[in-house]
UniProtKB/Swiss-Prot annotation:
Top-rank lineage group of the source organism: Eukaryota
GO molecular function ontology, one term from the record: RNA binding
InterPro entries registered for this protein in UniProt: KH_1_KHDC4/BBP-like, KH_dom, KH_dom_type_1_sf, KHDC4_KH-I_first, KHDC4_KH-I_second, PRP5/DDX46/KHDC4_KH, RIK/BLOM7
Stretch list, region Disordered: 1-150, 252-284, 383-434
GO cellular component: nucleus
Ranges annotated as biased composition (Basic and acidic residues): 8-67, 252-262
Lineage: Eukaryota, Fungi, Dikarya, Ascomycota, Taphrinomycotina
Entry protein name: Uncharacterized protein C30D11.14c
GO BP of this protein: mRNA cis splicing, via spliceosome
Length: 534
């Protein structure tokens, strides 16, 4: 009985040693309760100090002790925090030092990726260690940059052979003459000389690190049936890579023109001060010179001032531009020119704007514009001196309404000239002589004119009748009386207003009878022995 109790007590002591502080307290309280003598509870401050001592004994030393004891042998994981200094220059220098150290560490741990065309895998190579010297700086802009073409060993991949076909890739992404190598004409020339097949693949990347497996950098894919042709193709490609093609940009645009007139001190400045005063390639940028020639006329109703200045379809302005090599535009109020900046006409009076780089050309154009404006002033004065037709004038051209009397007289004269050619004109009787009475139709009494009536009636005779063709049925040819001629026949201008046109014939009925006699006589003269018409 006593042995079993001793064994259990021994186990309790062993387990108590392996338990933590918290379980030890709980067991001590439990034992004290069993014995009936309860120990007093410890304060929070005492337990906190005991906990710190427990951590310092069982684990690493406290954080503060790392820096206080130099003999402990622990190296600091982080550098101590520098105390702020009152000197701004020292603080800036320290910040710059820290930035430089971080950049050096970043460069040391960086890696670059290169694409292998033959294997199609991505390989990563670590950069140089921090102790390696920094790469050389790029050449300064003062000296000309020299493009050294890469060697063929650096840009060609391994030869892939299979089924009697040899394939190889040549990377030209960073080659200066890549734009010439990818041309169809260049590829055809290399194919004809070497007997291989060339294909341009990939895409151009200014930064080759952005290339992917799907879109590799720009390269040439060579397919050949023997190694000899493949070697010839590589030699041709190398010759194109090393060929000096001259400047890729036309440098003549950036060269300053040697013009003595421009360097003249009396000539105005023709260089703009855009930005730093220089254009591309450090050369001054040229500026358009302007000259305004005012017209000094106000647009008036009925006088087209703009049309008079520019001419039909701008012919006057175009002539000045061709003669002087300048640009001439009409601007201002009433010019219909919309300013791009304000989207409306300018507030200035109407004028001609001359623009050019050459001041002498502007002066020549100014003289021609002044002559044109002087001519327009004369046209305006001539238009203003005609107050009756002012509202109907168009510039210097007046609109004259048609004269009806002249129009009808001209029409009568034109139609008189176009009478039938087969009708011969009959002689006219003197107006002072009385008209003789002749029997026009056999068996019919002759019609006598009233006494005292004279007329310029042409009496046709049988000898004057036409032998061929029938005349018009609306009047005898050559017969004219005041107011009796049909439109287009007779002598114009003999109609007297207010007078009966049939008074000379004794009335309208007598005229109709006379007309029928004339028609019958003409028909009888043509037909010969024709019977009387029914």
């Amino acid at each position: 009985m006593s042995d079993s109790r001793q064994n259990s007590q021994r186990e309790d002591n062993y387990s108590r040693d392996r338990r933590s502080r918290f379980t030890e307290d709980s067991y001590s309280r439990r034992d004290s309760q069993r014995s009936g003598n309860e120990a007093p509870r410890e304060s929070r401050y005492y337990r906190k100090e005991e906990h710190l001592q427990e951590r310092s004994r069982s684990r690493s030393p406290a954080r503060d002790s790392r820096w206080k004891s130099s003999s402990s042998g622990f190296a600091p994981a982080h550098p101590p925090i520098e105390e702020p200094t009152n000197n701004g220059a020292e603080a800036a220098a320290a910040a710059a030092r820290r930035i430089a150290e971080s950049l050096q560490s970043t460069k040391a741990t960086s890696s670059r990726t290169s694409y292998d065309h033959s294997e199609g895998i991505t390989s990563t190579t670590s950069a140089s260690p921090p102790s390696a010297p920094a790469p050389p700086l790029p050449p300064s802009s003062e000296g000309p940059a020299v493009d050294i073409p890469p060697s063929m060993a650096d840009i060609t991949s391994k030869v892939i052979e299979g089924d009697g076909v040899f394939m190889q890739d040549v990377e030209i992404n960073n080659v200066r003459n890549r734009y010439i190598l990818v041309r169809a004409s260049t590829l055809s020339e290399i194919e004809n000389k070497s007997g291989v097949q060339l294909f341009s693949k990939g895409r151009y990347y200014p930064n080759k690190a952005l290339a992917t497996d799907k879109d590799p950098p720009l390269y040439l894919h060579i397919v050949s049936h023997n190694r000899k042709d493949l070697t010839v193709a590589l030699q041709e490609i190398e010759s194109w890579i090393n060929k000096d093609m001259g400047p890729l940009i036309d440098e003549r645009r950036f060269r300053r023109r040697e013009d003595n007139e421009r360097n003249n001190s009396n000539s105005p400045r023709n260089f703009s001060t855009h930005g730093n005063g220089n254009g591309e390639n450090g050369q001054p940028r040229r500026k358009w010179l302007e000259e305004k020639v005012y017209i000094n006329l106000t647009p008036s109703r009925g006088f087209h001032l703009r049309q008079a200045i520019v001419g039909p379809q701008g012919a006057y302005v175009k002539h000045i531009q061709q003669e002087t090599r300048t640009r001439v535009q009409i601007k201002g109020q009433g010019s219909a020119f919309i300013e791009p900046s304000t989207n409306r006409e300018s507030d200035e009076p109407i004028h001609l704007c001359i623009m050019s780089h050459d001041p002498n050309a502007i002066q020549r154009a100014k003289v021609l514009c002044e002559d044109l404006i002087a001519s327009v002033h004369q046209q305006y004065k001539a238009w203003k001196s005609q107050p009756k037709d002012r509202d109907q004038n168009q510039g210097n051209r007046a609109y004259n309404p048609p004269n009806r009397n002249q129009a009808f007289s001209a029409r009568d004269s034109r139609q008189e000239k176009t009478q039938p050619t087969n009708a011969s004109p009959a002689p006219l009787v003197t107006p002072s002589l009385p008209v003789p009475s002749i029997p026009a139709v056999p068996g019919m009494e002759a019609m006598a004119m009233p006494p005292g009536v004279t007329s310029s009636i042409a009496v046709p005779t049988t000898s004057s009748m036409p032998l061929q063709g029938m005349p018009t049925m609306f009047g005898a040819p050559g017969v004219s009386a005041p107011g009796t001629e049909a439109p287009g026949t007779g002598t114009p201008g003999l109609t007297t207003p207010g007078v009966d046109p049939y008074a000379a014939y004794g009335g309208y009925n007598a005229y109709v009878q006379y007309y029928q006699q004339q028609i019958y006589a003409q028909m009888h003269g043509v037909s010969g022995d024709q019977s009387h018409p029914q």
